[in-house]
Amino acid sequence: MSEIVDTELLVNCTILAVRRFELNSIVNTTLLGSLNRTEVVSLLSSIIDNRDNLESINEAKDFLTECLFPSPTRPYELPWEQKTIWAIIFGLMMFVAIAGNGIVLWIVTGHRSMRTVTNYFLLNLSIADLLMSSLNCVFNFIFMLNSDWPFGSIYCTINNFVANVTVSTSVFTLVAISFDRYIAIVHPLKRRTSRRKVRIILVLIWALSCVLSAPCLLYSSIMTKHYYNGKSRTVCFMMWPDGRYPTSMADYAYNLIILVLTYGIPMIVMLICYSLMGRVLWGSRSIGENTDRQMESMKSKRKVVRMFIAIVSIFAICWLPYHLFFIYAYHNNQVASTKYVQHMYLGFYWLAMSNAMVNPLIYYWMNKRFRMYFQRIICCCCVGLTRHRFDSPKSRLTNKNSSNRHTRAETKSQWKRSTMETQIQQAPVTSSCREQRSAQQQQPPGSGTNRAAVECIMERPADGSSSPLCLSINNSIGERQRVKIKYISCDEDNNPVELSPKQM
C-alpha cells in the first residue's frame, strides 16, 4: 500500500476515518503529519482491528478502500438516448401492470358474483403484482438506470423488503391455487375450500413472505462512492455481518435460499399438480362422460386449468433468466465489469417485472367473465362515458325478470287448462347449473284446496352473475307467485353454490 498511495493521501484518509468513526478521543489528528508512512499504515490497521464487530470492520474496510483507491471516473453512465429508450420500455410495462391489476382488483371486490374461491387467490396475486410494480419496480428502475440511489436509507430498506415479500407472495399464491385446483379435479368428493379458509391461507402466505424477507429489514444499507473527477454515487445494498456482495457468503446463502423456496420447489410442486390434473382432464374418458352435464363440467374445468397453466408457465419463463444471471454473476465476478452489463441487467429485470403485466392480459384472454368487465371499463374510458354505471346483481335479476314477463304470460293460460294438481311448496334446488332447468313436484289430484303448479327456472345470464329465481303459478287465480327457495350461483367448476342473503 505504501508504494501505491502517497503519504498525503494516507494521512487524509486516516483523518477522515477518525472523524467517520468518532475516534477523536483516541487519535490526535494534529500529530498525524509528523508520522512516517509505516506508522500511518499501522494506525489505519489499528482503526480496523479495534472495531466492535465484524460488520463494523467491513464498514471500515469499505470506507478506507473507497478513500485510498477511488475510481478515476464515475462508471455505468448511459447516454441519454439509451436512457430514454429504457424509460419508454419500462414506463409502458409499469403502466399496463398497474392499470391491469387495478382493474382486476376492482372486478373482484366490486362484483359479488366474482367473489369465488379461485378469484380470491387471483385478487391476492394482483395485489402482490400491484405493490411490486408501484413500490419496487419504479424505484429500482431509476436506481439501475442512473446507477445512483437518491431515495435515502429508509426507503432502501423498504424497497428491498417489498421486493422479496411481493415475489414470495406471488409464487406462494400460485402454489395455493394449484393445490385448490388439484383437490377440486383429482379428488372431487373432498370438501371444497371455503372462503373463510381462503382468507386464512392468504394471511399465512403474507406472514411467511414477511418472515423470509425479514433480513432485508436488518441488513439493508446505503453507501456513497467518490471518484477522482469529483462525482459520486450512492448505492443501496445488503451489508451482512461478513461483508457484502460479491464477497459475503451470507448474502450468497440468503439469495440461494430465496431462489430455492420461491422458484425451485414451487415450480416442481406445481408441475406435479398440473400433470396429475392434466391426466384426469385430458386422459382416458370416464363412464358417462358423454352426458351433457359431465361434458359441460369437464369443459369448464379444462378452461380454468388451462388458464392457470399459462399463468405458471409465464411466471417460470419471466423469472428464469433473472435467477440464472445472478447465479452466474456470483461465480463470475468479472461479469460486473463488462461493457454491456447494465443493459443485460435491465433486460433481465424488465422480463421478470413484466410478469405482473402479463397476468391481467391472461385473465382477459382466457376468462369470459373477466373479459366482459375489462371490455366494459376499457370501452368506458375510450368513449368517455363517465356516467356509465354497472348493474348490481340484484338489478340484473330484476331486469331478467322483466324480460321474462312475456314468456310467463303465455304459459299462464296453459297452466290454467292443466288438470294436474300440485300443492304450493318449496322447489328443490337442482344439482347442476345448466342454462335453463325446470323442476316440478306433483301430488295426486284432490289432495288440497289451494292448488298451484310450481316451476323453478334456474336461468344463468351471459355473465353468470345473477342468482336463479323460482316462480309459482297459481291455477285458481291464474297469477304467478314467488316461491321461497334457496338462491344458488355457479362456481368456477360450473357447480351450484348456495348463497346467503348477504351474498345475493
Swiss-Prot record:
The places in or outside the cell where this protein is found are: Cell membrane
Membrane spanning segments where? 85-108, 119-143, 156-179, 200-224, 251-275, 309-330, 344-367
Q: Which residues form a coiled coil?
A: none
Main location class: membrane
Q: Which residues lie on this side of the membrane: Cytoplasmic?
A: 109-118, 180-199, 276-308, 368-504
Where in the sequence does glycosylation occur per the annotation? 12, 28, 36
What spans does the record annotate as topological domain Extracellular, numbered to this chain? 1-84, 144-155, 225-250, 331-343
Record field: compositional bias (Polar residues): 395-404, 416-450
Q: Which cysteines are joined by disulfide bonds?
A: none
Entry-linked InterPro entries: GPCR_Rhodpsn, GPCR_Rhodpsn_7TM, Neurokn_rcpt
UniProt-listed SMART domains: 7TM_GPCR_Srsx (SM01381)
Pfam families, A to Z: 7tm_1 (PF00001)
* PANTHER family according to UniProt: G-PROTEIN COUPLED RECEPTOR TKR-1-RELATED
Functional summary from the UniProt entry: Receptor for tachykinin-like peptides.
Q: What is this protein called?
A: Tachykinin-like peptides receptor 86C
